[in-house]
Amino acid sequence: MRTTNGRVRNARAVQDENRARPPMVVRLANQWWDRLIGAVFSGSLANQTARYAAHRTTRDYVFNSVGFGVWGFLFPLLTMVASQLVGTEGAGMFSMAFVYANLIQFVGMYGVRTYQVSDVDEMDSFGAYQIQRVLTCILMVGVGYLYCSLRGYAGELLWICFGTFAFRTVDSLADVYEGRLQQQDKLWLGGASQVLRCVLAIITFSVALLATRSVSLACIGMAIAATLSLVLFTIPLTYFETERSRGWELLEIREIFVECFPTFLATFLFSLIETVPKFAMEGTLPYDYQLYFNTIYFSAQGITMAVGLVYKPQLVRLANIWSNPSHRKRFDLIILAITGVAALITAAMFAFNATVGVALLSLLYGTDFEAYRTQLYLMTIAGGMTAVIDFLYQIITVLRRQETATRIYLIAFGVAGVLSITLVTTIGFDGAVYAYLLSMAALFVMLVVQYVMIRKNG
């Protein structure tokens, strides 16, 4: 009897302890806050003892996949929220501003991430990468201001652009710290940082829009949330969990700008190629069509994201494989394998869109997308080509031959400009979709030929 009573008391004690124990999220936040405050009082973030091990392949894939997925799903999810709460016109304005923010983000990123993480011997210091990124983010802000001034934006649209541009600027700055974590083989921590920033942005935007019905205030709140996550989590985490880097030199900053300029130019041109049809629609078609185009574009973007989840965690290892001449055939097999994966994902996405995709989009956005079924199919095919284009360019960067692709992107940009202006003017929204598809097809063919030539000559 005493034993039974003792067991009952022990069970009750455990239950009471569990009730008193705060939720896991609260415990993690408290632990992080204690660690952060302790580091601040000690006078140095970089001298703290790392608590997390490197070389965690499974964690790298899981956290990077979640982080990349949340980051990629951020735009479509926020567009869904805006469409449901403020209608297609307001959502179209937000969608257009976010597209332009994504475009000028390439100025802030400057094509450095792949170069940074494949710098396995740390030829350039982390301090140099940080300073270079601050400079490009300042340039990004200047480009955004200049664009809004030239377009004559005012009122609600101007503030929407301000909020989205600010958010993407913070996102660009955070990328250099997450790149440092990946370079130190702690990619999963970079993924965790990305998840936190995006989740806070989604929550803040949604709550602010629900409370105020103001897209501009929601965008500004989103930017503030991202800034807090950068200052209170991403930057301290990077200093805590990576080795102290040597001091920076001015020559290193110059070298990063020079070496990554071809990558920046190519990626910026690629983003321009994707954006030109949307530029052509602005002023010609109502803002609603920006929403429709970007919604079916998300299908293409999803394919690129899915393929990126396969190969991006392995960029450092691919660089090491390429550095050994005896492993070049293995390198080629990896290229073929990932291209095959892209084809399979494209086929799966096409089948999904043909069965439930249109109905799902109509439900999520609160508007009928049946009239855009054919355009959705065409955009899915373009997405498969886009995924391979992105992959091949990353590989060319790993091979340090990125300058060879710049001419190709310039040609493709010219093709996209001519097609977009001509087709949108003559046949409207359908013309924007056809222009995007044909531009991606031209770029795909030219880039495949370029890669074959590099391998043949190298």
Predicted segments — roles?
Residues 28, 55-72, 97, 102-148, ...:
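Membrane-water interface segments that mark the loop-to-transmembrane alpha-helix transition
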Residues 157-165, 191-241, 259, 297, ...:
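Hydrophobic alpha-helical transmembrane segments
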Residues 23-43, 52-110, 141, 202, ...:
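Signature of the first transmembrane helix
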Residues 60-79, 196-201, 217-237, 249-316, ...:
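Transmembrane helical elements of multi-pass membrane transporters/channels
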Residues 75, 105-124, 183, 300-326, ...:
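Helix-loop junctions and terminal segments of transmembrane helices
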Residues 86-92, 148-164, 287, 354-384, ...:
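Interfacial segments at transmembrane-helix termini and the short loops linking adjacent helices
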Residues 38-57, 188-193, 215-222, 231-274, ...:
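Interhelical loop/hinge segments that connect adjacent transmembrane helices in multipass membrane
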Residues 1-73, 117, 121, 127, ...:
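N-terminal membrane topogenesis motif
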